[in-house]
Curated annotation (Swiss-Prot):
Disulfide bonds: none annotated. Catalyzes the condensation of carbamoyl phosphate and aspartate to form carbamoyl aspartate and inorganic phosphate, the committed step in the de novo pyrimidine nucleotide biosynthesis pathway. It comes from the Archaea. It comes from Methanospirillum hungatei JF-1 (strain ATCC 27890 / DSM 864 / NBRC 100397 / JF-1). NCBIfam families: asp_carb_tr, PRK00856.1. GO terms for biological process: 'de novo' pyrimidine nucleobase biosynthetic process; 'de novo' UMP biosynthetic process; amino acid metabolic process. It is an enzyme of class 2 (transferase). This is Aspartate carbamoyltransferase catalytic subunit. Belongs to the aspartate/ornithine carbamoyltransferase superfamily. ATCase family. It catalyses: carbamoyl phosphate + L-aspartate = N-carbamoyl-L-aspartate + phosphate + H(+). Pfam families: OTCace, OTCace_N. Heterooligomer of catalytic and regulatory chains.
Length: 298
C-alpha cells in the first residue's frame, strides 16, 4: 500500500486489517522504534488540531520525527509555487507526507508527483480516510460494523468525514439514515454512488423520527468555511442540536460520534451520558494513525 488517498483505495479486508492493527499497535511496538530515522512531513494548508497532532503523536510514539511545513503563508506557495512542485521538493526531505488541502482532489494530485507515500488528511469537501478509519474503529469497540443503522446529521453537503464514512460502510451492509438542513444533504452524485454500491440510504426530515432506530448517531458541524454564501450559513446555523431530552428512547448501546471540533450541535450536557463517544473517538486517532503509518512506512 503506497498511498492512502481515498477510502475507495481500501477494500474491506484492508480496512479490517488496519482496524485490527490499531488495536494491537501500542502493545506490539512497546519499547520498539520501528520508524526510527524516518521523517513524516506534515503539510497542512487548512486549520487542524486533532488530525495534525495525532499524526505527530503517532509518529513520535513509533520512534520517528516530524517536519511541519505550516500554512501557505509561510511556504513558497505564497510566492506562487504549485502544489506539484512543493510535493516534489518535500519528497526529497521526508519519508511520507500527510497532506491537508482546501481543494478536492489535491491529495490525489500530490500522489502523482510524490516519490513517497501520501496520506490524505482531508481535501476540501472531498474525503478524509484517516478519520473514517478512526470512526470505524470507535464503532467496532462496542458493536459489530455489520448491518448497523447509522444516522448522519448535519452538513452532509460539505462534510468530507460523512462522505468517506458512508462509502466505507457500504462494505458492511449498513443502513444509512441522513438528516440535514435544507440544501445541505448528501450531494446527488454521492447519494447515487452509494446506492450503486448497494447501500440503503434513507432521508429524514427530522432526527426525532429515526433516533430510536439508530445504533450510531454521527453528528457534524456546519462547514462554515465552505459556504459560498455566508448568509446561507446563518439561515441554518441553529437548525439542529443534540440534547439529553432527545435521547430518552434510544437503544442502550447507541454511540454518538462527532469528528470534532464541536460548535453548538451537541449540548455539553450530553458529554457525561453513556452514549457520548466523541472524546474517546478523538483519542483513538493515535493508534489508528500509528497503524496507518506502519502500513505505508515499515
Amino acid at each position: 500500500m503506497n498511498h492512502i488517498i481515498s477510502i475507495h483505495d481500501l477494500d474491506r479486508d484492508q480496512i479490517d486489517r488496519l482496524l485490527a492493527r490499531a488495536g494491537e499497535v501500542t502493545a506490539e511496538f512497546a519499547g520498539k522504534e520501528p520508524l526510527k530515522g524516518k521523517i513524516l512531513g506534515l503539510l497542512f494548508f487548512e486549520p487542524s488540531t486533532r488530525t495534525r497532532m495525532s499524526f505527530e503523536s503517532a509518529m513520535l510514539r513509533l520512534g520517528g520525527s516530524c517536519m511541519n511545513l505550516g500554512g501557505v503563508e509561510v511556504s513558497s506557495m505564497a510566492k506562487g509555487e504549485t502544489l506539484a512542485d512543493t510535493i516534489r521538493v518535500v519528497s526529497g526531505y521526508a519519508d511520507a507526507i500527510v497532506l491537508r488541502h482546501p481543494k478536492v482532489g489535491a491529495a490525489r494530485l500530490a500522489s502523482e508527483f510524490s516519490e513517497i507515500p501520501i496520506l490524505n488528511g482531508g481535501d476540501g469537501a472531498g474525503q478524509h480516510p484517516s478519520q473514517t478509519l478512526i470512526d470505524l474503529y470507535t464503532i467496532r469497540q462496542s458493536m459489530s460494523l455489520d448491518n448497523i443503522h447509522i444516522g448522519l446529521i448535519g452538513d452532509l453537503m460539505y462534510g468530507r468525514t460523512t462522505h468517506s464514512l458512508a462509502y466505507a460502510l457500504t462494505h458492511y451492509n449498513a443502513r444509512i439514515h441522513t438528516i440535514a438542513p435544507k440544501g445541505l444533504g448528501l450531494p446527488d452524485s454521492i447519494h447515487d454512488n452509494l446506492e450503486e454500491r448497494g447501500a440503503t440510504v434513507i432521508e429524514h426530515d427530522s432526527i426525532e423520527e429515526v433516533i430510536s432506530d439508530l445504533d450510531v448517531l454521527y453528528v457534524t458541524r456546519l462547514q462554515r468555511e465552505r459556504f459560498p454564501d455566508p448568509a446561507k450559513f446563518y439561515d441554518v446555523s441553529s437548525s439542529y442540536r443534540i440534547t439529553p431530552s432527545l435521547l430518552t428512547d434510544v437503544k442502550e448501546h447507541l454511540a454518538i460520534l462527532h469528528p470534532l471540533p464541536r460548535v453548538d450541535e451537541i449540548d455539553p450536557s450530553v458529554d457525561n451520558l453513556p452514549y457520548a463517544r466523541y472524546f474517546e473517538q478523538a483519542r483513538n486517532g493515535v493508534p489508528v494513525r500509528m497503524a496507518m503509518l506502519t502500513e505505508v512506512m515499515v
